[in-house]
Design a protein with these regions (language model features):
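Conserved structural elements of the adenylate-forming
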Residues: 1, 156-177, 195
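Structural core segment of the AMP-binding/adenylate-forming
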Residues: 5-6, 34-116
Length: 197
């Protein structure tokens, strides 16, 4: 519940940008468990491409894989005019390499976030279980943005029920069984990767 300790509330959106990494997928689950909505973005997007999604989804929290992604987010947070994303108040980063001298407000490592979460859980031991229990199949599970090739990208809201049904169909079609391994190598922002991850 480190996110909750930072002020993240049910219904809020959390942007996630980076390559396939365990902490990024754990943040998907943490966000959903707190009844929030992950908004994955393509790791190769330039800052200007990210600005629209961050504003459109009204993102206040973002998880960045590394310094490259943090730099893009900080650039947008400091920008003025059309590229500005002033609502982005918290940036969490996974890979600490290159981050030693970064001291911007609202910037925190995954390790620091997890320490906050442990402390918050001691004070509110039932909160996580209560939020998970309140989740519903028709709650939005993720917002996936289209590529924007025919105009501005569009946020597609997918429910938990829709993803469970699609996952079942994929498992049946591919003949997957318990114990089979699936390698996730596509960008987390693509629906196919999200489905099998």
């Amino acid at each position: 519940c480190g996110l909750t300790a930072l002020g993240f509330t049910p219904g809020q959106n959390l942007a996630i940008v980076g390559d396939n990494r365990p902490h990024l997928y754990l943040m998907f689950l943490a966000t959903q468990s707190l009844r929030g909505v992950p908004v994955p973005m393509y790791q190769d997007a330039v800052a200007t491409e990210m600005a629209f999604v961050l504003r459109d989804a009204e993102v206040h929290f973002a998880l960045a894989e590394d310094q490259e992604q943090v730099d893009k987010l900080l650039e947008l947070r400091a920008a003025t005019g059309e590229q500005a994303v002033p609502g982005l108040t918290h940036i969490i980063y996974d890979d600490p390499r290159g981050m030693r001298n970064y001291r911007q407000p609202g910037l925190i490592s995954v390790d620091e976030l997890m320490a906050l979460g442990r402390a918050h859980e001691r004070e509110h031991p039932q909160l996580f279980a209560d939020l998970v229990a309140q989740g519903q199949p028709d709650d939005v599970a993720v917002i996936l943005y289209t590529s924007g090739t025919t105009g501005r990208p569009k946020g597609v809201c997918q429910t938990h029920a829709a993803f469970v049904a699609s996952a079942r169909g994929g498992v049946e079609t591919d003949g997957l069984k318990a114990g089979d391994d699936v390698l996730s190598y596509l960008p987390p922002a693509w629906v196919g990767d999200f489905l099998f991850s």
